[in-house]
Amino acid sequence: MSLSPHVENASIPKGSTPIPKNRNVSSIGKGEFLGSSSSNNSSFRMNHYSNSGQPSVLDSIRRPNLTPTFSYSNGVYMPESHRTSSFNDSYLPYDKNPYAKTTGSMSNKSNMKIKTKKNAINTNTRKSSGLIYTTKVDKELSSIDKVNDPNINGLVCAGKTHLGLYKFSPSDRSIKCVHDFITPNSNTSTRGTTSLLPKLSKRTRQNKFSTIADVKTGFNNYKNCIAVCNNSTAISIYDLNKSSSIDNPLITSLCEHTRSINSFDFNMVESNLIISGGQDSCVKIWDLRSNKSKSSNRSDISINTASDSIRDVKWMPGYNFASKNDQGSSTYGNLKSGYKFASIHDSGYLLKFDLRQPAQYEKKLNAHTGPGLCLNWHPNQEYIATGGRDGKCCLWFVGDNANAAENTVLNYGNSPSLHVPNTSLNNSGSLAFPKLTINTDYPVTKLKFKPAYSSNIYNSLLGISSMGDEAEVRIYSLARKYIPKHVLLSETPSLGLVWWDENLIFNIDKGTRINGWDINKEPTVLENLSKNTTTWRDLDGNGLLSVDQEIGSYEVVEPELQPTSSTTCKKHPGTIKNPKNGNPENQGIIGGIKKGFSHTGLTSFTPERPPTLKAGPTFSTKSLTLASGASSFNSSSASLTSLTPQTENREEIAIEPPCIITLDIPQIFNNIRLTKIAHSRKKNVISESSSMKNSPVEKFKYLARQLKFSYIREHNVSDSADTAYKNDIENIDVVKNATETHGDNTTTTNNNDDGDDDDDDDDDDDKIIESHLLKKYNFPENNTWATLMNEKVNNKKSKRNSSSSREFDEKDVRSSISSISASRQSHDRSRKIDKNVEAELQEKIQTLVDLISIATHNASVYLSIDDLTNFKIWILIRDSLLWDLKWMTSSQISSDNASNMDANESSDFEAGENLKTGKEFPEEDGAGTSGAESLVEERPQAFRANSDEPSDAEKKPVSKLKEQLKNTEIIPYAQPNEDSDEVLTKLKELQNQRLESRTKMGETVSDDVIIEEDEHEHQEEEQPHDSPTKSAQFHASPIAKSIPILQKREHRKSFIDTFMLHSPNGYNGDTDIGNEDDNISPRFTYNSVSPRSKVSSLQSYATTTSQLETFKKLSSHTAPIIGSPRHAPSRPDSIGREQLSSSLTKKLAKCKKIIADPPWDTKKLIKQLYNQATETGNVVLTVNILFLFQTIYQITEIDIAKDAIAHFLLLLHRYELFGIAADVLKYCPFEDIMGSEGDQSSIRLFCERCGELITNESSKEKLRAEAQQTGNKKIMDKFGYWYCDSCKKKNTSCVLCERPLKKLTMVILPCGHEGHFQCIQEWFLDENEQECPGGCPGVAFI
């Protein structure tokens, strides 16, 4: 609300100097900078030192007039030059401001600068309209107080050389100095001046007050009294009514303190009492009626607080607040007002006393971590606000414990500040925490509550003034402690404040100005704050941050009061209970206390002394009677009992959190550009994936969040799947046992039925195994393996349904029964496998399963952003890992079967399709072709149980290779020649070496590796079969007899094995993972046969003359593979006693065990992918490969891997991906990944008992040696830092379970007790406890 020019002109009293506008220091003249000529170079400043009351030497230096750099008045924090002045913009227009005339000599450049700054002010900002009074005095000011007379609009201001009475006029809004009690008038004689200060000489330098210069005024009968420090240890009392030149205004001087006085105060109920406190840590109470002489060096009551120096001391106020209702009017008061007082000390302690029991304080609170500087009582509730050097303003409840529940207030979500718990020295002391803490950025030297009644403490207003250079007075509402309600700006730093009434507040500043504001006309900080703010982000300057929040309020809704009785009329808000002089026969409060506590033995309590004969001009009686003191309370005691407001617990005010929106400017601009291009080309809006492609930063963030970098944390997921799998197996065993039990009571029909039952059990078992592996591998339903397994189930069902139609001869039935019994025997022997080897193999399998799952997940992540290149890379890695997993699972299952096979069992030549290519070849016409069923087995070896191995009679031929070999040109012989014997001997030796090497490595021997030959026991002549009709019949028959060969073994089909056999030159083995000792290289001879053909490459040569040469090429790769345990070697179907040719035997004799890794080898493949990623700069893929495969395949040097991961961590930190960086460090397989940077974040633990550094190296070496001797790695779990080797004692135990704290530890901040995370969670969350488990008082958890 703006005012008219008349009002603005009227606000400036005639003859006074208005406050200038804010200007740059460089534009102020020399005289203006130094201040008025009447001001001394030594300016006053209040000092707060615990050891001395003397001023600092630095305080004698005049400081320039400073203005705050930032202000709340214009919304967000704005520079001083851009903000709206809260004390001149509404009342002092620039053309009317006299201060502007003095700056007329300023340059045009400076004037232009002022105009520019004024134009920069936000037009939406509400300007200040609350500044009503302002004046500048010629004397230095340090303290201010109001005259407690409602008929006089008076203020008292004091300084070193000034004690003045000022009156303000609401009509013309002026402030005038009525009388100066130090500087005499022109008509005052020297003698009169000397009579004012009898103990001072006539020299000017002695006409000064103490550096403390606190000033207070009396109440009721003593409302005309002014108390001020005459010197450091004396209090002078002046009479306001004696302002003429002939009267001596000095009433008396109170001097008993041995050190400087810091504070004093008048009692509002017993107005004849005055209390003082100083550096001597003593509280002294004076009765003005007993001190009628001009000087008194003896107090009525002296209390030694036995603490540090007293900074501030205050009586409990005794306001009478009037309230009207239907029945009339009533008043609210406090029965304890005349007896209670409090003091705050340099040590930060807050002490509360009762005058009726002065020997012991009622409460002792540790209010501040540093020196406490000031305190103030709430007008009508037993709360005290304290301010300290630590920059905190705390609200404390100091009422009786019995009434604590009635006065309990909510904290409204504000956690209390941490204070050091202390134990009170008296029985009534209690451990307490502040109800509210307001954090400021400066020491708080002055604070005062608004003198208004409030039933809810949070609806109270509190004015705060600082000790620093903040040129402002902040008014806080306790309902909103973070944002002040009003910020009243002044030209220079504020020195003090006083509330005149509920709406008017005055302050003084270092610029010797007195300012007065009407807070009802002053804008709140929230009104000037911007409702939404936008600022640049700190990271690289490429983003915006916006915050939007509702305004809220500064008040808490409270119910209306319903008074029930009233006996008095409405009074002035500032009036106090008027005690009656009453009956002189009774004693006053001081007399009653002296009689009641004469037996307490208080050393500082002095006995009653005889009254002085000389009476003062304003004192009629010696002391106030007890009846008069009691009557002041009895008049309203009845109404107080029923009308005292009770503060009720209410629900917290829900303040919605701010909504934060982040914007990435480069991405926004890029999206705008792409949108315009798409619109011009009439395309739709780009998808999220395409926008991610155009923003490399977002793509990197997305990949870092979605990709999996470590298989260590995948064990938890796999463990849960394994648990479910084990539960399923247990359920199967239960069903089997129940079936077997039931089967014992029945009769079995025949052996074939038993075999069928076993097959059914195996099918149920295999079904669960297959579903479990499918879940682990994350295969889709249309995957090749899933299709084969589903087809196997259908074939099994159809086989059982059509078993009656099949025709078996006696040999087939016997072979089937013998195979079943052999499988059962082998299953029993498989239980005797070495447990260590089995556990090691299971661990390798689990690692491969986790890596396959991660590869599948990473591939899907790249597919979601249409990155097909990296998608194919991860699919290739997954297929390679599947190959390794297939070999491990198959070798584990079939290892015992291979060791128990008979030497005369036959083996068919295996041929199949490539698993990794996944191509399906069309079937060719002709009698020499075979279907797709002949190229792959019904169920892969990895999914097949030992007992489910088909017999020779049930096996179908894989191809017509045997028929082709029968038609080859052979030479029968009766005795093998030397060349053939040498070849066979060589093959035998190589097989034995292979078996020994596998046994030493602790691995199971697969039947694909060992070739058993028995030339002396089983020798059968192979008969020629030339008829083409026989070949057709061979494929048509469901059960075909195999060709008799010299070497026979149990047939074993594998889908993945066909991958290597489908190459044009046959199968080439592979070396083991990470085997660096194999120096064997392959010899590949590719032919011109189309890879689409389903039959073997040898079949296409069946009708040519080069059949023997083709077989020689095939036979050149039949040598066993040494050091290649992962792949089974291919070998011919039979080695008969027929000698094919001399060239063939020579070729076989010259065969070498030189076979290198095939192209699909996992280690070789991953190394190539790593090199490609480093060359192309694919950071994510490079780091991902190092994380997953470095420890398994040794992709690169360990130092290079650590350096790459360290740079990747820095990149994550740069893009604020701190959570992912923490996971990378947590699951990284390497130690000291950050190198030298990691040493900077090391944590040193010290023993709580002996104080030594906890290293525990001796116990670590002892446990390590024990672990090496016993081979038990779990022994190292005993090592930790929860004990100390130096003192041989444990550190802090859990407060709940009292066990050592070894892992995650929680600390209860209020009391410092520690406990396990599970224990603390159970105590506070599960059991809903709020106190500490150790029994500490106070609420520890809200």
UniProtKB/Swiss-Prot annotation:
Residues 753-766 have a biased composition (Acidic residues). Belongs to the WD repeat RTC1 family. The modification Phosphoserine is found at S1037, S1081, S1088, S1090, S1124, S1134. One of its GO terms (biological process) is positive regulation of TORC1 signaling. One of its GO terms (molecular function) is zinc ion binding. It comes from Saccharomyces cerevisiae (strain RM11-1a). Residues 1-39, 559-593, 600-619, 630-651, 736-766, 788-831, 942-963, 1014-1047 are annotated as: Disordered. Residues 952-963, 1016-1028 have a biased composition (Basic and acidic residues). Its main location: other. InterPro entries: WD40/YVTN_repeat-like_dom_sf (IPR015943), WD40_repeat_CS (IPR019775), WD40_repeat_dom_sf (IPR036322), WD40_rpt (IPR001680), WDR24 (IPR037590), WDR59_RTC1-like_RING_Znf (IPR049566), Znf_RING (IPR001841), Znf_RING/FYVE/PHD (IPR013083). One of its GO terms (cellular component) is cytosol. It is found in: Vacuole. May be involved in a process influencing telomere capping. Residues 630-644, 815-824 have a biased composition (Low complexity). It holds the Pfam family zf-RING_16. A zinc finger (RING-type) spans 1294-1336. Disulfide bonds: none annotated. WD repeats lie at residues 207-248, 256-296, 305-342, 367-406, 439-486, 489-527, 844-884, 1130-1170, 1217-1256. This is Restriction of telomere capping protein 1. Keywords: Metal-binding, Phosphoprotein, Repeat, Vacuole, WD repeat, Zinc, Zinc-finger.
